[in-house]
């Protein structure tokens, strides 16, 4: 991959969505997963054997399409350089564009974000994408336990996603005014009820977090809540001893439940600098700090302004939301050298294609056609590489990312210098 994790993951997810939507006319779509470190000559030999065996397919059309797909994959393997540290995934097959006779060969070569572990060869009516789902899952998980005498919340933070797993209430009475033996007896009952509540929290925490710990995906536990209850819970033996070792810190909070988790993440931000959620939040807050300055500071936003400044090499960090939905289209004349690049909303591509049929070349009057379509984020990533600009693709699941999407049409930037 290119080295920009947010861009790479966005493009990988986009490819996965596209692949899952492809369907062959018959059992003729080929999926090949090449493990990291596997010799390509071994894979090629296996495919040549499959090519030979495909001559036994009864349907001549299916046989021809399967053989064409295998040959395309063999050609792509020749272009790869060993060793492949991550392995490679190749999909190829004839995809119908409409009725009979509209099939066109499509091939996809993906470099996975994590090493491919197992060799797979699959011939089916759909591309085999199940293993790709595992690659897009965030592997690091933080466990969260919010607790006070009345209620508790157990949850996880995984990448940008906050998940509440369990909410508990104690039924423990509050303080009271009384005296004598009755008061002492009630106090013992309250303490016992509080103890039993802590035991329940510990049991649910063990049930929730131990499987994640055993998979080696639990990065740590964060404990929070109002008052001293959280400290008692952390210090005593309510948690499984292996989970106690994973406690990162405890935090004083005003709230429990999901809002309390967000409050905890804010307070724990110094500890969670590497968490995607905090990196995005800090970057977008930096943009807004520039924006609210009287002269606009080092901020830029909107498609026209950002594209202009990026071409000048003036952007330090480009922020793009994953829902931007723009395609960079290269249009050419079939009669002369005229070329034009335009940004088109992805959901309006069919309309753009229809309009292009009636549009004449401004230079010679010839017919125009689409030469290339590219996702705008992929296009921007290539420009950023040229100008040594950082590009961050942010989720709209967060409040900050949603603001960038709504207010600035999904595109904002922090400049290197004032323009």
Curated annotation (Swiss-Prot):
Pfam families: eRF1_1, eRF1_2, eRF1_3. Its main location: cytoplasm. GO terms for molecular function: translation release factor activity, codon specific. One of its GO terms (cellular component) is cytoplasm. It is found in: Cytoplasm. Heterodimer of two subunits, one of which binds GTP. Directs the termination of nascent peptide synthesis (translation) in response to the termination codons UAA, UAG and UGA. Belongs to the eukaryotic release factor 1 family. This is Peptide chain release factor subunit 1. It comes from Methanococcus maripaludis (strain C7 / ATCC BAA-1331). The gene is prf1.
